[in-house]
From Swiss-Prot:
GO MF, any single term: lyase activity
Family statement drawn from the similarity comment of this UniProt entry: Belongs to the LarC family.
Official protein name in the record: Putative nickel insertion protein
Pfam families: Ni_insertion (PF01969)
Domain of life: Bacteria
Length: 395
């Protein structure tokens, strides 16, 4: 059965913390080293040490690599990863993380992705961190990744470009690109690094899932702090009754808006989805004095109601929000990864009362493949569905 993992980022996330947490949750260090050797690059090693910090026992992962100013482009890193013998899903996840990092760096520096030269994240230890997380998830059988809101910290951090405010511009750009939820935190250190942010932006949905818990892992960061500088992961199996539990106890929030620009309303819908809303949609309506407007609706679980109402009040011009409890019928669904000659794409399958009745490729995966290889989007959809029908699933 494909597994589910939840990154509980109560003290942020970095690449080495993520590696340590996966190892602490049961990932074999020997198996991870063997997977990373498929990168065909020399000069690194990976150690893992059990530590006790305050009330917590966990694992500190440390990548040993030569220090130095290595400037690699995205194409350089793609070449290292794509020419490896790693599984297709690991290559795909790693590429996705580095692409998000490159896009954020390009945005911050006002240039294009092809002109970006990675500094810290181009170093060998950072490559091992990122590919190691992707390989670790694959070895653990994880197909669905979830994450908590992220604390960022405060103050200043040193970088190859000189001192930068915390959170770093790259970290903020990455989190903004996916509407990731953040939490206020004035700890005077960098809690969420660009690498950690990119891992979650590329792979995670920002909500807590229903799951049957199998293991817990704590990954320690290098810095010693008054509070535990740790990342916690929850590893488990999907709850077979998750969908049934969602049929009851849902809240439908609605508000009418006729005095706000469309792009701001679109942003509000993105923020609601990132916060964990089950569904968000807009309906055109005609309001008083014949003014066109929209009805913004959000379907949320009861425990998310207060958060969603606050977001609606803060992100829109509304003066009030209606609420009502609702029930819904839902199909069982799962996601499989389909390996194609052009890359891996996820497909969502739906079942009704045990019978498979439909499947749909994930648009973002297919669009990325189409852009990278210069082929029509419809052709990618057709290729993915053809591979699915022929049984070319990864799971």
């Amino acid at each position: 059965m494909p597994r589910v993992i939840y990154f509980d980022c109560f003290s942020g996330i970095s690449g080495d913390m993520a590696l340590g947490a996966l190892l602490d949750a049961g990932l074999s260090l020997d198996a991870l080293r063997e997977a990373l050797r498929r990168l065909n690059v020399d000069g690194w090693d990976l150690n893992a040490m059990r530590e006790v910090r305050g009330p917590l026992a966990g694992t500190r992962a440390h990548v040993i690599a030569p220090e130095g100013h290595v400037h690699r482009t995205l194409d350089d890193i793609r070449a290292i990863i794509s020419t490896s013998s790693l599984p297709a899903a690991v290559i795909e996840r790693s590429m996705r993380i580095f692409a998000i990092l490159a896009e954020a760096e390009a945005q911050v520096h006002g240039t294009t992705v092809d002109r970006i030269h990675f500094h810290e994240v181009g170093a060998l230890d950072a490559i091992v961190d990122i590919v190691g997380v992707a390989a670790g998830l694959d070895l653990l059988g994880v197909e669905q990744v979830f994450a908590s809101p992220l604390p960022l910290g405060a103050g200043w951090v040193r970088s190859a470009h000189g001192p930068l405010p915390i959170p770093s511009p790259a970290t903020l750009a990455i989190l903004a690109s996916v509407g990731a939820p953040i939490t206020p935190d004035e700890t005077p250190f960098e809690l969420t690094t660009p690498t950690g942010a990119a891992i979650l932006a590329a792979l995670a949905t920002f909500r807590r899932p229903s799951m049957r818990l199998c293991a817990i892992g704590y990954g320690f960061g290098a810095r010693q702090m008054e509070r535990p500088n740790a990342l916690r992961v929850w590893l488990g199996d999907p709850d077979e009754e998750e969908d049934a539990s969602r049929q009851r106890g849902l809240v439908l929030l609605e508000t009418n808006i006729d005095d706000q620009p469309a792009e701001q309303i679109a942003y509000a819908t993105d923020v609601l989805r990132a916060a964990g809303a089950l569904d968000v949609w807009c309906t055109p309506i005609l309001m008083k004095k014949g003014r066109p407007g929209v009805q913004l609706s959000a379907l949320v679980t009861a425990d998310l109601e207060d958060t969603a109402v606050s977001l609606l009040m803060c992100e829109t011009t509304t003066l009030g929000v209606r609420r009502r409890t609702v029930e819904r019928h839902v199909c069982d669904r799962d996601i499989v990864e389909i390996a194609t000659p052009l890359g891996v794409a996820r497909v969502k399958r739906k079942r009704w009362r045990g019978e498979l009745i439909g499947a749909a490729p994930e648009y973002e995966d297919c669009a990325r493949i189409a852009r990278e290889h210069g082929v029509p989007l419809a052709a990618v959809y057709q290729m993915v569905m053809g591979r699915l029908e022929n049984g070319a699933t990864k799971c």
